[in-house]
């Protein structure tokens, strides 16, 4: 769906004609999708008085000059100058009776009349509201947005303020089109013919700009996402510098590679080196090698990289000028974070709390009645309001990631290597095949297809009759991505090999064992271990806390006597040879002779062999010192307890991953090997990334494309509409009371089959009925135990039934409920929920887990937290979930993928990789 690209605050209109563009004009162009011009937060009004950001630097001087002449209050006469966050939560944004034009909240009236009569009804409504009423007087507004034209001018005169126009101008008083209005008129901003004359320039104070931005947001998802990534990027300066450094690294790798390949005369170097001729680097550089030596194909790709770098620089400029500056202004004046350095210490929970205090200052999120006589005025429907609490903010930021988490955990994506995998080659398995490269391609193909430009799910996916057509389109999208990856594969492989070499060489030189011995979680493990609605910084912190316990658990298992003894032998021999060479080099060193340059073999000096044997000694010594035998771990020490089972359970407190298949086997090597597939060696992950560049085209063509129908079905069946939030993933709503209708139908169908099979087998004897009752009680007790944070060890003690396949399906659905419970409990912990709330949730979850096995009633609203309600609590929402897909609300949008382009998708996913 194309979006209008509104003018930013720093743009000016043409001097003649209508200086402002029509809001209905389609500005979705190729360049706008690349540079992000269509991704702004609010659409400014047609008659809004624009200003020049270049004069913002004089704002403090103007305030100082005006304060010396008159003590003017920016927040209305007679009101205290208090911080916005300290004001009342139900503050009124409407103008006072003396302000013109008045801001009227959108009424609720039945659209039963013809469209031609709507304007007359609005005019009658506005006329009636402008007349004096006998109803109780309105409350005095606690906040009033002044007009910048009337506050600051060149002559320094201050005049009466007026309210800036809100986004919804349909229910505002019609603006006057009198072009002869004086500059001092309080309604001057409504005139489309106003121009700057006689050198008069107007500016809007930064705080009012931030308030206007917040009051007129139309894309809450994008604004909150940018707000979060600004917090995660630690401020504007760090974000800009990081982007510039990334581009400089790219330029250096390209330039340095081209110089080493075509810029040096290696033949001249080797010929003169053998003859001991004195040469310098200037003698080896080929003049004009870019023109004469570089092949035409390489020049073509270099030109493409140059265009890409230029586009990235232009994109960075627009992001800085139109996004980062506005976000910085918002943090400074509304979130009350004056310095970006504070973002390094402040918690996200605090930012969410301060953001929630602003909900009454936005027409989309405000739920406060602004008039005492509320019955005499039209008010907005609260059910359509945009929700704004910790859960809603996380759902908006993680809307796409929640679907990806569910796709990986439910094994919807088939990424197996069965046609290519060799049993003797176990470097790449089905879990390690998901690399960053493949992950980026999957996001590029799925997210840009399933979601529109507004961040919402495309309505066509939610309709069952579009399933086959959409599956074909997604299949074609996967195959197109495979072709592009196959064409670019040689160049991407060379680039990443050089990138990894330059990045890790210094680390390898200083600590050779760091590359061979360090472990980290694989990309597959990151999606498998991530909870729903878990923001990236929470997830990264949780994984970092698990690194130490995970290493301790792995080191408890012996690697094998052959490997340990062989490494001890290599360590001793390499250390002995290196020691002799170093001693001889120090002993025979004088002015005439240098043992360091002595050639032990032809062309190889002593220093070469010292570096080789030193590397072997460092690697083997580190490996043997951290070997996982009981002797090396010193069991006599009081700080060590050799208990792999307890260690793995401690690791699961951070990873939240302890599948039931591991129960009773936590001490075995098989479980340790399965865990090592998730927590693998860093060198293996790097090799997998390089091999994945070659395998990605085949996986996309043969495997991912075959899952197109399952992906479409997943988005249709596991999408829930929430009023004020839109369509979100079912598992992200933490709805434990009931499952979705589609899920419930499949689960009841499988349970019905298992019950019928058990009845047929137990109808002969009454003793078997007793066994089945015990079985059902065990299943119920299992569901209650699985509602806890850690997995129950008694899950594997269930009696074995003949219908193992249906039991496995039931356990799979049970695991999804369990993961939702874990995600919800960790969500409460991350945002500092009280113990009383946690106890209430635990008590509810026990009942819900008990009833979820035999529940067949219609779906009901999601879990409501017990306890006193607080409008400003982080978790104060009870969602009204609408499971019915209303076709009237599902307007046919642009076919997915038609207007997003490759470069536009690259721009969309670039900010998701910041901070990785």
Swiss-Prot record:
InterPro entries: Autophagy-rel_prot_9 (IPR007241)
Transmembrane intervals: 239-259, 294-314, 569-589, 606-626
Start-end of Basic residues biased regions: 750-762
Biased composition (Low complexity): 92-105
Pfam families (alphabetical): ATG9 (PF04109)
Record keywords: Autophagy, Cytoplasmic vesicle, Endoplasmic reticulum, Golgi apparatus, Lipid transport, Membrane, Phosphoprotein, Transmembrane, Transmembrane helix, Transport
Coiled-coil segments: none
Biased composition (Acidic residues): 115-124
Reaction equations catalysed: a 1,2-diacyl-sn-glycero-3-phosphocholine(in) = a 1,2-diacyl-sn-glycero-3-phosphocholine(out); a 1,2-diacyl-sn-glycero-3-phospho-L-serine(in) = a 1,2-diacyl-sn-glycero-3-phospho-L-serine(out); a 1,2-diacyl-sn-glycero-3-phosphoethanolamine(in) = a 1,2-diacyl-sn-glycero-3-phosphoethanolamine(out); a 1,2-diacyl-sn-glycero-3-phospho-(1D-myo-inositol-3-phosphate)(in) = a 1,2-diacyl-sn-glycero-3-phospho-(1D-myo-inositol-3-phosphate)(out)
Lumenal side: 260-293, 590-605
The keyword Signal appears for this protein: no
Region spans: Disordered: 1-27, 86-150, 747-814
Intramembrane region ranges (chain numbering): 482-502, 682-702
Modifications made to the protein after synthesis: Phosphorylated by ATG1. ATG1 phosphorylation is required for preautophagosome elongation.
GO biological process: autophagy of mitochondrion; lipid transport; piecemeal microautophagy of the nucleus; protein localization to phagophore assembly site; reticulophagy
Start-end of Polar residues biased regions: 1-11
Domain-level remarks: Forms a homotrimer with a solvated central pore, which is connected laterally to the cytosol through the cavity within each protomer. Acts as a lipid scramblase that uses its central pore to function: the central pore opens laterally to accommodate lipid headgroups, thereby enabling lipid flipping and redistribution of lipids added to the outer leaflet of ATG9-containing vesicles, thereby enabling growth into autophagosomes.
Described purpose of this protein according to its UniProt entry: Phospholipid scramblase involved in autophagy and cytoplasm to vacuole transport (Cvt) vesicle formation. Cycles between the preautophagosomal structure/phagophore assembly site (PAS) and the cytoplasmic vesicle pool and supplies membrane for the growing autophagosome. Lipid scramblase activity plays a key role in preautophagosomal structure/phagophore assembly by distributing the phospholipids that arrive through ATG2 from the cytoplasmic to the luminal leaflet of the bilayer, thereby driving autophagosomal membrane expansion. Required for mitophagy.
Protein name: Autophagy-related protein 9
Organism the protein comes from: Scheffersomyces stipitis (strain ATCC 58785 / CBS 6054 / NBRC 10063 / NRRL Y-11545) (Yeast)
């Amino acid at each position: 769906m194309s979006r209008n690209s509104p003018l930013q605050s720093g743009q000016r209109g043409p001097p003649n004609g209508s200086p402002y563009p029509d809001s209905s004009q389609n500005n979705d162009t190729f360049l706008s999708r690349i540079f992000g011009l269509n991704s702004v937060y609010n659409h400014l009004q047609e008659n809004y008085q624009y200003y020049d950001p270049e004069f913002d630097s004089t704002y403090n001087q103007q305030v100082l000059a005006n304060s010396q002449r008159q003590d003017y209050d920016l927040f209305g006469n007679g009101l205290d100058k208090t911080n916005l966050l300290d004001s009342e939560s139900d503050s009124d944004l409407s103008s006072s009776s003396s302000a013109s034009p008045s801001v009227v909240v959108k009424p609720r009236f039945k659209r039963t009349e013809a469209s031609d009569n709507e304007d007359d009804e609005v005019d009658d409504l506005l006329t009636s509201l402008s007349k004096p009423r006998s109803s109780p007087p309105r409350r005095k507004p606690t906040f009033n947005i002044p007009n910048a034209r009337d506050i600051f001018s060149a002559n320094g005169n201050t005049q009466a303020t007026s309210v800036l126009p809100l986004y919804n101008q349909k229910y505002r008083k019609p603006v006057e089109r009198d072009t002869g209005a004086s500059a001092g008129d309080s309604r001057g901003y409504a005139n489309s013919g106003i121009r700057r004359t006689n050198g008069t320039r107007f500016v809007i104070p930064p705080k009012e700009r931030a308030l206007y931005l917040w009051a007129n947001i139309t894309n809450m998802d994008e604004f909150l996402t940018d707000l979060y990534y600004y917090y995660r990027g630690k401020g504007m300066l760090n974000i800009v510098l990081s982007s510039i450094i990334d581009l400089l690294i790219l330029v250096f790798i390209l330039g340095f590679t081209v110089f080493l390949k075509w810029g040096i005369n290696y033949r001249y170097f080797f010929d003169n080196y053998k003859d001991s001729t004195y040469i310098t680097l200037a003698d080896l550089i080929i003049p004009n090698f870019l023109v004469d030596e570089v092949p035409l194909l390489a020049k073509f790709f270099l030109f493409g990289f140059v265009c890409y770098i230029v586009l990235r620089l232009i994109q960075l400029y627009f992001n800085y000028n139109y996004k980062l500056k506005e976000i910085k202004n918002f943090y400074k004046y509304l979130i009350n974070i004056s310095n970006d350095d504070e973002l390094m210490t402040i918690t996200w929970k605090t930012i969410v709390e301060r953001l929630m205090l602003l909900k009454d200052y936005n027409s989309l999120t405000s739920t406060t009645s602004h008039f005492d006589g509320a019955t005499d005025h039209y008010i907005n429907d609260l059910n359509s309001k945009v929700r704004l609490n910790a859960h809603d903010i996380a759902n908006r930021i993680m809307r796409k990631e929640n679907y990806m988490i569910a796709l990986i955990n439910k094994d919807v994506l088939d990424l197996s290597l069965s046609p290519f995998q060799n049993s003797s080659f176990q470097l790449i398995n089905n879990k390690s095949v998901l690399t960053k490269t493949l992950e980026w391609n999957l996001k590029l193909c799925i997210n840009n297809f399933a979601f529109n430009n507004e961040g919402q799910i495309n309505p066509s996916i939610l309709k069952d009759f579009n399933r086959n057509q959409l599956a074909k389109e997604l299949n074609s999208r996967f195959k197109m991505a495979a072709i592009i990856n196959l064409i670019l594969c040689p160049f991407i492989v060379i680039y990443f090999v050089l990138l990894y070499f330059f990045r890790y060489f210094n680390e390898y030189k200083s600590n050779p064992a760091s590359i061979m011995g360090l472990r980290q979680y694989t990309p597959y493990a990151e999606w498998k271990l991530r909870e729903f609605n878990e923001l990236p910084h929470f997830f990264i912190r949780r994984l970092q806390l698990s690194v130490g316990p995970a290493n301790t658990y792995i080191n408890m298992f012996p690697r094998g006597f052959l490997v340990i003894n062989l490494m001890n032998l290599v360590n001793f021999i390499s250390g002995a040879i290196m020691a002799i060479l170093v001693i001889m080099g120090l002993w025979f060193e004088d002015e005439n002779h240098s043992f360091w340059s002595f050639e032990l073999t032809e062309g190889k000096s002593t220093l070469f062999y010292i570096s080789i044997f030193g590397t072997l000694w460092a690697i083997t010594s580190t490996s043997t010192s951290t070997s996982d035998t009981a002797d090396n771990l010193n069991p006599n020490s009081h700080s060590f307890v050799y208990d792999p089972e307890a260690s793995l359970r401690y690791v699961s407190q951070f990873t939240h991953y302890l599948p039931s298949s591991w129960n009773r086997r936590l001490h075995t090597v098989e479980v340790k090997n399965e865990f090592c597939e998730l927590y693998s060696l860093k060198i293996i992950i790097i090799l997998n990334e390089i091999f994945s560049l070659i395998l990605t085209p085949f996986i996309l063509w043969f495997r991912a494309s075959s899952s197109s129908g399952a992906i479409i079905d997943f988005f249709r069946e596991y999408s829930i509409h929430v009023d004020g939030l839109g369509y979100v993933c079912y598992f992200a709503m933490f709805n434990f009371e009931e499952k979705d209708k589609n899920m419930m139908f499949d689960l009841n169908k499988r349970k019905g089959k298992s019950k019928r099979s058990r009845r047929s087998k137990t109808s002969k004897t009454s003793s078997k009925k007793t066994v089945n009752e015990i079985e059902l009680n065990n299943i119920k007790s299992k569901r209650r135990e699985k509602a806890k944070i850690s997995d129950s060890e008694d899950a594997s003690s269930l009696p074995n039934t003949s219908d193992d396949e249906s039991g496995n399906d039931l356990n799979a659905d049970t695991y999804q409920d369990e993961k939702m419970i874990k995600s919800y409990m960790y969500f409460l912990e991350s945002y500092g929920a009280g113990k009383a709330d946690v106890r209430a949730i635990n008590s509810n979850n026990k009942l819900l887990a008990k009833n979820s096995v035999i529940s067949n009633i219609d779906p009901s609203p999601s879990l409501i937290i017990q306890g006193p309600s607080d409008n400003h609590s982080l978790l104060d929402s009870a969602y009204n979930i609408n499971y019915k897909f209303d076709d009237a609300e599902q307007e046919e949008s642009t076919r997915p993928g038609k207007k997003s382009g490759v470069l536009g998708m690259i721009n969309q996913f670039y900010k998701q990789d910041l901070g990785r």
